[in-house]
Regions:
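ATP-dependent phospho-/nucleotidyl transfer catalytic cores
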Residues: 21-122, 133-237
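Conserved ATP-binding subdomain of kinase catalytic cores across diverse folds
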Residues: 2-89, 132-135, 162, 174, ...
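Hydrophobic HxD+1 residue recognition
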Residues: 124-125, 130
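Regulatory N- and C-terminal appendages and interdomain linkers associated
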Residues: 156, 160-379
Length: 379
């Protein structure tokens, strides 16, 4: 996620035991697998759930000790995640908390837009998996979109409320929970500011999403026409069973060579291999119409080569799809770490071409992986 440009905690190392095993239950089989620990690093690992716990204690118990613990936690949040909200001349907690509310909402909105940009579905985005500093925290049942389905959820227990399209709604609920947990430490002005941030959150989301959508489409500014273009594209992608990563990346090829493609009647050619189902004549016609509208808009955006390069800087060519990761850990289990090492190199520069890896990794998900438990969806 870090190399994709998405705010995230980072992995330092993985340590595997050579003796201890744990019972893991998979679909249709029960296995003992080696135990391992992942060491992650970040400015903090503070979650909304932490704040909820101490906020509830302070609210329900009402003791000086419970209130002090909540204050200590929030001072730590400020010091580690929002030091710009501290006043060196004033150690008072209340005004610092009030100054922190809006940046917290802004970071949450930015994180949701960045997840959308790269097609990331967290799968279980409740308060225990929501970082107070606006970073990607928990990588449990996550999944990157293959076939675009806005209702996709990578966790079998997530239903639609943790789906790709509803992650911003979950973020709003988590933000509301965080603000509610601070309530007993805010005065009336601070409580009103918290409610105003919640009221403004849809606008913060709209601004963050407009920015990433504009960049993904290669546009210089966002307006109602650009919004319609993007909405129509998403509808086409869903109707056509388009691969999220492949389609966005290959649009840059259309932008770069549009004049040659149009002259040869080959406008759809760069998008071939991006769909999980054959395109009907009606969908082919719809794609052609959309591409013409989009290219007409792009002609006023600058040099074709520059537009294409800008699009490639925000539309990754490679993301850690679960079937790729499974291939790596199955090889590692057999003592071959070359696959994992190569993927690590690719994911360190996911916007680069890596032509030697295209056939293997810049492709639709293998047929046998498209519905496989533990790959397509996780428990």
């Amino acid at each position: 996620m870090y190399h994709l440009g998405v705010p995230s905690t980072r992995a330092l190392c993985v340590v595997m035991s050579t003796s201890d095993t744990a019972l893991r239950e998979w679909v249709g089989e029960t296995l003992f697998e080696p135990c391992a620990m992942t060491c992650r690093v970040a400015r903090s690992f503070l979650r909304v759930g932490h704040l909820e716990l101490f906020g509830r204690r302070a609210r329900d118990f009402g003791s000086a000790e419970a209130r002090l613990e909540l204050e200590q936690l929030l001072r730590h949040v400020l010091a580690r995640e929002y030091p710009e909200c501290l006043d060196p001349q004033d150690d008072s907690l209340r005004p610092a908390l009030m100054r922190m509310l809006r940046p917290m909402g802004e970071r949450m909105a930015q994180l949701m837009a960045q997840w959308w940009r790269v097609g990331f579905c967290q799968g279980n985005f409740q308060s225990d998996n929501c970082h107070l500093g606006g970073r990607t925290l928990d990588f449990g049942p996550f999944g990157f979109l293959e076939r675009y389905n806005p209702r996709y959820c990578s966790w079998s227990g997530g239903a639609e409320h943790f789906s790709f399209r509803l992650q911003p709604k979950a973020a709003l609920q988590n933000l509301a929970s965080a603000i509610r947990a601070m309530d007993c430490l805010l005065d009336s002005e601070g409580r009103e500011e918290g409610q105003q941030v919640l009221r403004d959150f849809p606008a913060l989301l709209a601004e963050a999403f407009a920015e990433v959508r504009m960049e993904k489409l290669g546009l210089c500014f966002w307006d109602s026409d650009a919004a319609r273009l993007c909405d129509e594209l998403l509808q086409l992608m869903e109707a056509s069973a388009a691969d999220w990563t492949l389609l966005w990346r290959r649009l840059a090829d259309v932008a770069q060579d549009w004049d040659e493609l149009m002259e040869g009647g080959r406008l759809l050619e760069p998008l071939q291999g991006s769909f999980y189902l054959p395109l009907s004549p009606e969908l082919e016609a719809a794609w052609s119409r959309w591409l013409l509208r989009w290219l007409t808009r792009l002609q006023g955006e600058g040099d074709c080569e520059e537009v294409a390069q800008q699009m490639r800087r925000v539309n990754p060519k490679y993301v850690p799809r679960n079937w790729m990761l499974m291939e790596a850990y199955e090889a590692a289990e057999a003592g071959n770490f070359q696959v994992a090492q190569r993927l690590q190199q690719i994911f360190a520069s996911p916007y680069e071409e890596h032509p030697e890896d295209e056939a293997r990794y810049f492709r639709l998900a293998p047929v046998e992986m498209r519905t496989r438990p533990g790959v397509f969806v996780m428990s």
